[in-house]
Amino acid sequence: MLNIPEYRNYSGETKIALMDNSTVAFLEQVERAGISAKELLIGYEVILIPNWISEEICDSIYRKNFIESLVAEGLPIYFIAEENYTDLANGEEGNLYKIVFAAVSTLAAMRSYLHRHVEKSDSLDMEEYAIWLSKMYQNWPLSIITTKNGREKKKNAGEISLTILAEVFSWYYPNIESITMYTQDRDSYDYQTNARNYLRDAFKNKVSVDVSYKSND
């Protein structure tokens, strides 16, 4: 695991960045080329890496050491466990389910899994979020590849986690000034865009914060 602090509760941050594995790989190469990655990330009050993505980062000792070195240099980089998203959503697990469903709304296998294994006719009968999320990750409906170090790499898990986290911040904290997603993956943009369109109908009485993107383009 990454040897960096864990983020558990929102503390009023107004400039938030979310980062995926592809961006970490790119920035590590930038650093090797003599360009300060730290300078590119200054200005955010918190930079978050979901735990599913931290597992991907740790597939490479170079990426792992790079992130830990940025933390040692003072950048506010934290990992966040997906099970703790419920705390960010004020414990409103029904709404959190809607956000998860929205994040996977373009993936038929994921939708089918949620309909069959998570949804109940009465939402009060659903298992706790942390329980059904853990089961979903253990029984991942999309393809799984075993990496050289023996880890099971679950297709699109990181992108889905980023989308869920972005939407939780967006819909629950209207005073946030900016949410920036660092990714080189087009899927992340598509998932988040579709999730936003879905949630506009689900959360008609809420105001959302826009999510912006940065890549190496």
Locate predicted features.
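Short beta-strand/turn micro-motifs composed of small residues
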Residues: 182-185
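Active-site-proximal, substrate-binding regions of enzyme catalytic domains
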Residues: 2-177, 187-217
